[in-house]
Amino acid sequence: AKILDTRIISQLPNRYHGWPTLTRCKNGQLLVVCSGGRDQHVCPFGRVDFQRSNDNGNSWTYPRTILDGPIDDRDTGVLETMKGSLLVTTFTSLAYVPSLPKDNRKKGWLAAHNRIPEAQRKAELGQWMIRSTDGGITWSKRYPTIVNSPHGPTQLSDGRLLYAGKKLWSEGKDIGVCESHDDGKSWQWLSAIPTREGDRHQDYHELHAIEAGNGRLIVHIRNHNKKNNYETLQSESDDGGKSWSKPHSIGVWGLPSFLTRLRNDSLLMSYGHRRKPFGNQVRLSKDHGLTWSAPLSISDDGSSGDLGYPSTVELADNSLLTVWYEKLSGNRFAVLRQTRWTIS
């Protein structure tokens, strides 16, 4: 990849930013959401922060908090639907609780934790969506989605929205896809994605879906099973998402993957590379996801594995813009980084 420009786009230096998603609207405006306001990777402070750019990422608005529940709001996705609505996704977590200090060193953590009584905390766990029909000025109350994944749902050409993900808070932790027929207002379970022999489906995480140019649906899955550990696995559907192939390796070490369909119908996968060289990579498919190219490096100057979750959009001039989060060397607060690049 030919890198044109790399910069930090977050604007709160004393806050940790995590797990963003970038999307491009039909009018050319760019939107980024992230889990903002944080103290660290796991903490009680997470909220959904929203920024926009009207100049292809050269400048970004100051972040606006569009959702902040009483516990930790984590990975955030954003999408503009075919009808022009904006959908933002997140999930809530109490994973910070074991780290609550017993010795008052982090009084703020305890104060945040105690914003609601113990009895109500478990009821706050969920996977959530908020929706805007006025371009992000006003937002709905949050409402539950059946599954969650970091980057949220995808728009299909038949008008449906497809959300590939995991039932985070149900007993079975099922992996599969949901669909919406009403522009994201309500969601129905469509189908499970089968488990490969020898795998536990509980070790599949962080899915993302795209519709290829030939109508095939592709889902990428973060894999923590022993076989192909820390690789991105792939599953396909040729019947609109009613049935799926068993997940299989595509030879890509790195995770999680975000899928983009380019104007020329190539598919692009963007993923974090959490071993040396620490950074973010992309690969191209020119055959609707059958095969993937060798990796192209988008960034390789990371200092640790606390980085990634890249998402990529194609700009009007066919250059590409990728946004991810990264904890830079010497700074305990992760930032949002952006690079503009071309396929050289």
List PLM regions with ranges:
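Asp-box/BNR beta-propeller blade signature and adjacent active/binding-site loops
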Residues: A1-S344
